[in-house]
């Protein structure tokens, strides 16, 4: 079963069919909530999801350190009244009654977090005491800083799996982010090396990105200019290239990047996004949000 087939199958499930995916036995656990998730529409109900960092079996004391999802059904009315985000607090330990997920035919590309699902039956206690989970929370809160002689100090945004920092680009300070797999340190190295390679060739990249964006978007900028009530200066490819200002670059471990430029109000404050890769060069330029 591929991922698309799996998603379609889940979306067609009624609530009783969905609940049958989980084991009948109810167990008590202590769980460390990471953050509230969202909700996906099923057949007649919504599946709410809450990310957790780890849980401990309340009766056996066995600790499960794998991240996962706590799920529970909600009605259309509850969804519309935003009854998703008021049941749990981030980074808080709860004592719950849950049902473990049973055996299920899953696509190979399914993430471990998505596989590790628990069905919420009842909330028994908030701010429960659990030494092992408290230690995990303390460790989770510690900042992870990647030090690099060229890129400087980069801090891991654990929620987004991004290393974030800033550096000098063409004598101006810009923000950078490395889009990585936080559980795979080789992706840290690849993204860092890709960013350094681009930085070492920043003069060429800066010129090429500006010219590329100007070629792709000057005509559109002129249309926006013509919609102004008051006269504004003519926009040419040269003036477009000169007016935009690089603000940030996001780099992946595979060498793909997105560069975000300030538009100097040519698009009334919308950013300009230039995308490409170190291997293939520049691929697209668009007006962003």
Where are these regions (language model features)?
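OB-fold and OB-like beta-barrel modules that bind single-stranded nucleic acids
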Residues: 29-32, 91-102
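Short, structured beta-strand/loop micro-motifs enriched in basic residues and often containing a Trp
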Residues: 48-80
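Contiguous hydrophobic, core-forming segments of folded domains
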Residues: 137-205
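C-terminal structured interaction module
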Residues: 237-289
């Amino acid at each position: 079963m591929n991922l698309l087939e799996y998603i379609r199958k889940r979306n067609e499930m009624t609530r009783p069919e969905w609940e049958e995916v989980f084991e009948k036995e109810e167990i008590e656990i202590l769980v460390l909530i990471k953050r509230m998730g969202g909700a996906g529409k099923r057949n007649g109900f919504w599946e709410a999801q809450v990310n957790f960092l780890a849980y401990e079996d309340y009766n056996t004391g066995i600790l499960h350190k794998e991240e996962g999802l706590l799920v529970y059904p909600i009605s259309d009315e509850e969804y519309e009244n935003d009854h998703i985000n008021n049941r749990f607090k981030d980074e808080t330990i709860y004592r719950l009654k849950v049902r473990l997920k049973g055996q299920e035919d899953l696509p190979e590309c399914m993430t471990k977090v998505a596989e590790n699902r628990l069905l919420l039956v009842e909330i028994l206690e908030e701010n429960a005491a659990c030494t092992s989970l408290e230690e995990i929370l303390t460790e989770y809160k510690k900042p992870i800083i990647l030090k690099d002689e060229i890129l400087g100090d980069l801090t891991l945004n654990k929620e987004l799996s991004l290393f974030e920092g800033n550096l000098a680009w063409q004598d101006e300070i810009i923000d950078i982010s490395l889009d990585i797999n936080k559980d795979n340190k080789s992706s840290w190295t690849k993204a860092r090396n890709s960013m350094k390679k681009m930085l070492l060739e920043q003069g060429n990249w800066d010129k090429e990105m500006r010219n590329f964006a100007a070629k792709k978007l000057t005509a559109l900028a002129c249309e926006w200019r013509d919609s102004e009530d008051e006269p504004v200066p003519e926009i040419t490819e040269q003036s477009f290239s000169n007016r935009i200002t690089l603000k940030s670059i996001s780099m992946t471990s595979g060498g793909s990047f997105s560069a975000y430029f300030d538009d100097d109000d040519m698009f009334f404050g919308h950013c300009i996004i230039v995308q490409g890769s170190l291997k293939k060069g520049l691929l697209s330029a668009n007006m962003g949000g």
